[in-house]
Amino acid sequence: MNQSLLVTKRDGRTERINLDKIHRVLDWAAEGLNNVSVSQVELRSHIQFYDGIKTSDIHETIIKAAADLISRDAPDYQYLAARLAIFHLRKKAFGQFEPPALYHHVVKMVELGKYDNHLLEDYTEEEFKQMDSFIVHDRDMTFSYAAVKQLEGKYLVQNRVTGEIYESAQFLYILVAACLFSNYPRETRLDYVKRFYDAVSTFKISLPTPIMSGVRTPTRQFSSCVLIECGDSLDSINATSSAIVKYVSQRAGIGINAGRIRALGSPIRGGEAFHTGCIPFYKHFQTAVKSCSQGGVRGGAATLFYPMWHLEVESLLVLKNNRGVEGNRVRHMDYGVQINKLMYTRLLKGGDITLFSPSDVPGLYDAFFADQDEFERLYVKYEHDDSIRKQRVKAVELFSLMMQERASTGRIYIQNVDHCNTHSPFDPVVAPVRQSNLCLEIALPTKPLNDVNDENGEIALCTLSAFNLGAIKTLDELEELAILAVRALDALLDYQDYPIPAAKRGAMGRRTLGIGVINFAYWLAKNGKRYSDGSANNLTHKTFEAIQYYLLKASNELAKEQGACPWFNETTYAKGILPIDTYKKDLDAIVNEPLHYDWEQLRESIKTHGLRNSTLSALMPSETSSQISNATNGIEPPRGYVSIKASKDGILRQVVPDYEHLKDAYELLWEMPNNDGYLQLVGIMQKFIDQSISANTNYDPSRFPSGKVPMQQLLKDLLTAYKFGVKTLYYQNTRDGAEDAQDDLAPSIQDDGCESGACKI
């Protein structure tokens, strides 16, 4: 290697290249790692050096050389590359490897307008010194390379135009903790700050993108998911569109319920005009969604919901596909089709489904969610009423069209609205659930807005986080983690701003949280269980019972301290009804694990003191934030032992946790023979989870004789999901040959899954 090359330092000076210094940094980064070669990294990077190269480019070249060596046989390169990247990041942020004192850092960032000045108003210099003593900067060295790149690309406070970085990861974690507990009493708050900091910086609790990138900055909107219901009037349609623009500009993913909009050809003002139907208004919503990127962190994204019996359903089901022309397609949103038992019954009995415009059938739309018996009574009545415009379609044809579009686009989702209301924390008579969100894990009440400042409307918000099952040894640890997650997210509701009154009203009234899990596949592998063979059923029951029990207990304790949420009376919890009372009893045939916790005592305590939060759990996708914790995505099986994730920061390789010891214990996605075992597990989780679950269905066409997935199989899985009480289905993934070119490398759903959506974490 040419020792006489000149390099350009960060301050502009030039000097001869110092290969010893590079070697020392690499030796430091490789310490304690297995099966990594410093000379390999040096060889790969040296050939890319040139005269006059900047020292920062040398650093980036070495990092890239190490990252390119990450493989199934040498997974530790992900830590070597990460340590080098952390070194580089700290140099960029602080001009040196050693981080500055926390207090001085915060003062400087507040002066620059990067941090919220409330930090200096709420805490004294002395308290910052104490917080500084809580920080363990060496925890930066536990990140994988994929995690560091995600931090750099999405989470660390930075100037997105110039690329300047202003902080390191441990400052992010301690300051999120400081912001969230700033209103707690002075004598207890630093204890909570320390406990929360320890939980998030050791990856036991995983936080969503809006919290990681936003808390501590002057922008205060951190709810990941926003659910907006639209009424059947121009005023409401415009109010919905304004609300969408406000929220996509602030990092949120959107669920839109457009099911009330009347069908094409309906009379307006008693026949004075002829209605243009749903599609022009869906286009209007699509334009609103795409008008802003989510705070520079990701592009806007939405899922729009409508009932299966809508008169225009056959035109709506095809809106996403590649056929058709611009005029009859609205491709840049995803869609959720709403179904109930009556629709499934018609399918099973070979009957018809009758389609109506919601505007022609008084009471039917509301009953679809609030009262299944009343819905059936009205539906049959209107079917026999010759004065009402309608269309009959064979149920099997309509379901087949829906499943064909789900198969070809992967992005037609399913919401079983009866399960969402019968096994719900809300009383459907007063607070029916009429939609879900972008990624199908949220089930909350909404009311249409007539204008953006409508006091009577209700926009639902959900604030997310997750427990990392891979980072805990026993389920008992969940008790402390539940206390921290519930208290932090509950405090966030008071800490954040609400751009629209209808959102503030709902958030303050219901105080809804959605706490889920990541790293479930690792949890199964560690416990020697598999998705597909039933061996995980009892463990899953035990795990999710513990999660929901400890979350309810934490919210009940918080209610004793700070009062129940104001609209607690609209929940089923207020009547002493718990998830263990309303689950789908078909599950009892596939799981025989008894209940392990004292639910009766909890029931009494909830009836007496209430809950601080109307909902506590939801199982969301976690494509991005699971990379920070080096965890598997949500509840999903991994696609490969090494996954390749494309993000705007380039290709990131990530190896499944503890690969060397557990490689034979993991069950990969395409090794599962069918969806049955997975759907059973989702049903068992749904027994306890009070909101919903982003559950996917997966198909490998090569497993079928014709090389195509038969419609019969798609419908069978849809009915299996319904039978086990599954509320929602998210993606449908179809295996194509491309991802098998290298058997250990699996591209994950690209990181714009959910268009890199916000209701993931």
UniProtKB/Swiss-Prot annotation:
Site keyed Important for hydrogen atom transfer: positions: 225, 462
A GO cellular component entry from the record: ribonucleoside-diphosphate reductase complex
Regulation: Under complex allosteric control mediated by deoxynucleoside triphosphates and ATP binding to separate specificity and activation sites on the alpha subunit. The type of nucleotide bound at the specificity site determines substrate preference. It seems probable that ATP makes the enzyme reduce CDP and UDP, dGTP favors ADP reduction and dTTP favors GDP reduction. Stimulated by ATP and inhibited by dATP binding to the activity site.
Site label Important for electron transfer, positions: 730-731
Keyword tags: Allosteric enzyme, ATP-binding, Deoxyribonucleotide synthesis, Disulfide bond, Nucleotide-binding, Oxidoreductase
EC number(s) per entry: 1.17.4.1
Protein residues bound to dTTP: 232-234, 262, 269
Keyword Ligase: no
Positions bound to ATP: 9, 15-21, 55, 91
Function: Provides the precursors necessary for DNA synthesis. Catalyzes the biosynthesis of deoxyribonucleotides from the corresponding ribonucleotides. R1 contains the binding sites for both substrates and allosteric effectors and carries out the actual reduction of the ribonucleotide.
Additional information: S.typhimurium produces two separate class I enzymes. This one is the functional enzyme during growth.
Quaternary structure annotation from Swiss-Prot or TrEMBL: Tetramer of two alpha (R1) and two beta (R2) subunits. The B1 protein is a dimer of alpha subunits. A radical transfer pathway occurs between 'Tyr-122' of R2 and R1.
Protein name: Ribonucleoside-diphosphate reductase 1 subunit alpha
